Amino acid sequence: MSNLSKGTGSRKDTKMRIRAFPMTMDEKYVNSIWDLLKNAIQEIQRKNNSGLSFEELYRNAYTMVLHKHGEKLYTGLREVVTEHLINKVREDVLNSLNNNFLQTLNQAWNDHQTAMVMIRDILMYMDRVYVQQNNVENVYNLGLIIFRDQVVRYGCIRDHLRQTLLDMIARERKGEVVDRGAIRNACQMLMILGLEGRSVYEEDFEAPFLEMSAEFFQMESQKFLAENSASVYIKKVEARINEEIERVMHCLDKSTEEPIVKVVERELISKHMKTIVEMENSGLVHMLKNGKTEDLGCMYKLFSRVPNGLKTMCECMSSYLREQGKALVSEEGEGKNPVDYIQGLLDLKSRFDRFLLESFNNDRLFKQTIAGDFEYFLNLNSRSPEYLSLFIDDKLKKGVKGLTEQEVETILDKAMVLFRFMQEKDVFERYYKQHLARRLLTNKSVSDDSEKNMISKLKTECGCQFTSKLEGMFRDMSISNTTMDEFRQHLQATGVSLGGVDLTVRVLTTGYWPTQSATPKCNIPPAPRHAFEIFRRFYLAKHSGRQLTLQHHMGSADLNATFYGPVKKEDGSEVGVGGAQVTGSNTRKHILQVSTFQMTILMLFNNREKYTFEEIQQETDIPERELVRALQSLACGKPTQRVLTKEPKSKEIENGHIFTVNDQFTSKLHRVKIQTVAAKQGESDPERKETRQKVDDDRKHEIEAAIVRIMKSRKKMQHNVLVAEVTQQLKARFLPSPVVIKKRIEGLIEREYLARTPEDRKVYTYVA
């Protein structure tokens, strides 16, 4: 359609010549102007506008409005447009219902828009004056409303348009190629016909489109679930979401993206979350078992789109993780290696840290769930604190196979993660103190730096109160080294001899070290006892008022041992010879690294060939439990450790059993370390009960100290509030039970540190 011409040009056409108009207009003249304008509007609608003059038409419309005939012009315009749309346009569209419907409607819409732009330009003055004053729709919008009501929303056209669009989209979803441009034009038309709103587009297309889509996706989800594994299903859902977004971009209005994606998410994800997650041989557990980080990442990404999606995943993951963790901590049984036990937990943590980082976007919910699960199952086993300490002990001892200091550091950092999950940190501290003492006293620490690094980690985690005793142990070692240097200088200066004994004494501060107040008895052999007495006199001369108590259970010794192998008779048979009577090529010398108790037992055999269990007990005075353990190490261990033989050859040690030196003892090593039976497996049951008793005693004091601290500051408190406050203060070390706290409160009331108030027995006051 060509534009209106800007003037009459060289044409001799006088029909449209502008004449001067009178100041007042009679009806006849008004009608003639309207007829002229009406004819021009109809010509524009028929696309015959080439001979029309824009100026003349504008001036005529201006004249009508100026002389208060705007209403006639506005009403006339509405009637002309309505008539054209009903009689011509609607008929054309109705005739095309079964043939080229969308193309016909689109063409009619384009023609109508073009015509209305031209008509608006002619009637611009009416828009500015009459429309503004009377608060009616402007010319262009009036044209849109009439087109909407008389064409697009006309009964069967409206239904046919909706159905056509829905059918085309349904066909495209099945893989057919459709005219996307026609769909896009129709959707744009519906949006424009909403006049600044979405109502027409929403009611005539979007709502039924979303409804149809929901049904389609419902069917699709059933098909996908029946035919695919979880990972393939997830990929198909992702593809479906992307396809729907792409369709919106190219065919529909952008505002439809959010609602259609929500429909896909609801029908393909939300309604089937549990089914997808719990799919046998392909769901979340399968992915976790087989380390499928990529598939887990896809599931996380998809489930993060819907409400409770990640919660559903988390619950399933948590259930699997707890099952794995419980299996690890309950597999303990007899002979479970503490290092393997902790390594198993660390490996499990590493696996789930990898999932957290690579699959779950370091999500806070997953992070908290994993931490909560580890705390849950780690604390199911009361031996976890001891085993963690033994694990660290293993890493900080000399002779760790090929690990650099940096690798040890990394392992210790991982161990600290488990330590954070531990509720009984005070139990760990007690064991750590024992194991550190053993490392320091046997000179087995891999390095002072590594030890101090570990203490620094514990200090950062629990504060200096937790590590003050451990740091005190290091100070004692340093002071002991200085003391021993001074002692050796003293021996040189005085010429005093230790009788061939190379003595090293560590003076330990009671309270820092795991010393025993009731020290186990032990009759130390004369030579080492004499050497120690010389040291005692030297030390007490320097430090008057101090007392030295030997801690036999913490000592060690290197013994020079000579074994006389079997001697052959003339007939070729062999006879075992004990003692030091025979020398020859069969003599083998070793240095035996033993505990103080083992040294005391072995040195008896310098005096006699055989001893019964009762005789050894009588001679050494070692407590029965310690004696049995020492003899088992010497007579029942591996062949390369068996320096004594026992009759009968059983694992148990009882009265009447006879012990002799094993002269057939051989070892490839010159220096032989005699392992203490069960030391690597942690404490025996009686020892564990004893440790637990000590921990409980310590806890009583800690709970009472916390109660007094709180009451001193608050003066008056209700029972439940006090219990909560005490728990809060102590939870970094252990979780005291309310029953134990109540007992400690009662103990403090008896000792008159606290008192109950007369009016309420559940309220306590501090007694200064």
Swiss-Prot record:
Post-translational modification Phosphoserine, affected residues: S585
A Gene Ontology cellular-component term: membrane
Positions of the UniProt region annotated as Disordered: 677-698
Keywords: Acetylation, Autism spectrum disorder, Cell cycle, Cell division, Cell projection, Cilium, Cilium biogenesis/degradation, Cytoplasm, Cytoskeleton, Disease variant, Epilepsy, ER-Golgi transport, Flagellum, Golgi apparatus, Intellectual disability, Isopeptide bond, Mitosis, Nucleus, Phosphoprotein, Transport, Ubl conjugation, Ubl conjugation pathway
SMART domains linked to this entry: CULLIN, Cullin_Nedd8
Residue positions where N-acetylserine is found in the record: S2
PROSITE patterns cross-referenced by the UniProt entry: CULLIN_1, CULLIN_2
Cited InterPro entries: Cullin, Cullin_CS, Cullin_homology, Cullin_homology_sf, Cullin_N, Cullin_neddylation_domain, Cullin_repeat-like_dom_sf, WH-like_DNA-bd_sf
Comment field (misc): High-glucose conditions in renal tubular epithelial cells lead to up-regulation of CUL3 expression, significant increase in CUL3-mediated ubiquitination of MRPL12 and dysregulation of mitochondrial biosynthesis.
Disease tied to this protein: Pseudohypoaldosteronism 2E: An autosomal dominant disorder characterized by severe hypertension, hyperkalemia, hyperchloremia, hyperchloremic metabolic acidosis, and correction of physiologic abnormalities by thiazide diuretics. Neurodevelopmental disorder with or without autism or seizures: An autosomal dominant disorder manifesting in infancy and characterized by global developmental delay, variably impaired intellectual development, and speech delay. Some patients have seizures, others have autistic features or behavioral abnormalities. Additional variable features include cardiac defects, failure to thrive, or brain imaging anomalies.
PANTHER family: CULLIN
Annotated protein name in UniProt: Cullin-3
Taxonomic source organism: Homo sapiens (Human)
Taxonomic lineage of the native organism: Eukaryota, Metazoa, Chordata, Craniata, Vertebrata
